Structure formats: C-alpha cells, structure tokens
C-alpha cells in the first residue's frame, strides 16, 4: 500500500486546499534530492549507474568499442535519494459516496472499491489528520463506517439524490464552510430513476458545489445501468470549475481515473 501511495504521490495533490482554520493537518511530501550509492532497487538511477560502469570500464581498459557491452558491478550502482518534508496545512474532510444498487454488478462494485481504497490510502499517507466520512446508497442513503463501505454488497433501486441530500446535511451539521476544506467523491454506474436527475442536479448545483472545494464524480461502465447521469452532469454543470468528471471502463482505467480526480493543476 505504501509503495503505490508513494508512486501516486508524485503525480497527485489535494486540489484547491485553502487556509481556513487554526486546527491544522500535516502535509507530507517526498522530494528527490540527489544520488546515493545505496538504496532500494525501485529507486535505482539507471542512467547514472551505466555512466559509472562505462567510466570504470574505459579507465581500466575493459571497454571494447567493437563489442560495447556495459556491465555494472556493485560499486557502479547509483540510487535516487529523497527527503520527506512536512508542512502545516488547513483541516479538510473527504466525503465518499458509493452506489451499491442492483445495477452495479460485482465487477463494478469491485472497481469502485479499488479506486476509492487507493484514493483513501494516498490521502492518508500525504495528509495526516484528514477527516473521512462514508455514504452508501441505493434508493436510500446511509452513513457507514470505513470497513462497511469497502465490504458491503447491497442491491435495490437507485436514487442518487438520497446520497446528495445526506452529504448536504452532513456538511451543514459538522463542517462549516468557513473552517473546512470539503471534498466529495461519488462513484456510480450512472443509473438513476429518471425523475430523480433533476433533483440531483439541483442539490449538486445549488447546495453542494458552493460548499465544496471539489466534487469528483467517477462513473464505472456497467452492462446493467443506463449510464446517463454523467451526461446529465456534463450538460447542466460541466462548466463549473470545482467539478471533475471521470469514466472508468475497466480495472485498467482506475489509475487514470484517480489522476483525473486528484491530478495537479486543478
């Protein structure tokens, strides 16, 4: 987990974080600072290693231009070195929402869990003290603990507005906008009761987006769902600056989706 979180950490950051309160979280970032003679294989600096090997072979007369093989030995090995830096940041909360309705098959639910799991792992490894809340929904929404969020397998109809209402109420009760950086991430296959789309978009546009630093919606492809909710968001709210949309066709697309949701420069 730590290794993948470190890899992600080179390309991601919590978007639009702002100083809002005296209660700080700690941001930890890794920065490559130089080259060392020792280190793990995952950080081997191949260019520097082969340069050292070439220089050694030339100086000892073992380099043959007609047979230019460069064979590094232990003393040639060079590794990237890094330094962890910590800086105070303002407090933040991430609210995860996951569709567990019947149109979400086992594969779709697994893709959503994998993606949200790694986002969660990365956030915790880089933002010490960040708060997290978890919502699952089918036709109704409820708050659950982290373990239930990543393990529950429910079914039923879909009413996305139930999750957005609960998220809105959670923010109003516990997270004053003036004091918190608030992020909401919703994972679904985009299937929703037709009459509910209008209510969803109203809650999202009028209540959630004004309170959120960022709203991320990741839609997984499903053979059972209509998948139309992504298009509804694009047409009504796609121009809003604090909304990010991602499609996840399969497991191979998970990393790209994470980069879309939390990539630098947002």
Model feature map: region roles:
Residues 1-90:
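Acidic/polar low-complexity segments with low predicted structural confidence
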Residues 44, 49, 73-74, 81-95, ...:
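Acidic, glycine-rich A-domain
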